[in-house]
Amino acid sequence: MDIQFLGAAGTVTGSKYLVRAGNERLLVDCGLFQGFKPLRLRNWEKPPVDPSAVGAVVLTHAHIDHSGYLPVLVKKGFRGRVYCTEATADLCRILLPDSARLAEEDAERANRHGYSKHHPALPLYTERDAEAALGHLVTVPWGHDFEPVAGLRASFASGSWFSCRRSP
């Protein structure tokens, strides 16, 4: 098993960690980069891992820098499950569509006032993309073991902490 840091390294946003175990790929968190423009531009780059090769995502919590890239991942081909606690799912159902709405409003405003160098300015993702991502959520109770991908066991503990280990 190995882990690759795809975000939140050198910065505190864009949390994404790829766990590889044999042929399986698990993404821990799927966050947006936030802050100065060079960081935000990373959200528009080609995904750091082929979304269709990721078997599952585990969200430690709902903050946008941990969950906000999910609509992009789904739009680009992710078809697996997104495991999280009920509280995280509840918050994602608010945060992801709201984030999309804000991005759509920003793009509309940029187009109306002509201040974007992109013509037309587009949102990173839409409310429809956010709703599609929410369809992948699977809730897991605190302290219960689950197998997000073959060969890996995980469980959520208090706060935003979770454990991941090889299956026996």
What spans do the regions from the language model cover?
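Core dinuclear metal-dependent hydrolase active-site scaffold
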Residues: 1-52, 132-168
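Pre-active-site segment of Zn-dependent metallo-hydrolases
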Residues: 21-80, 84-88, 95-131
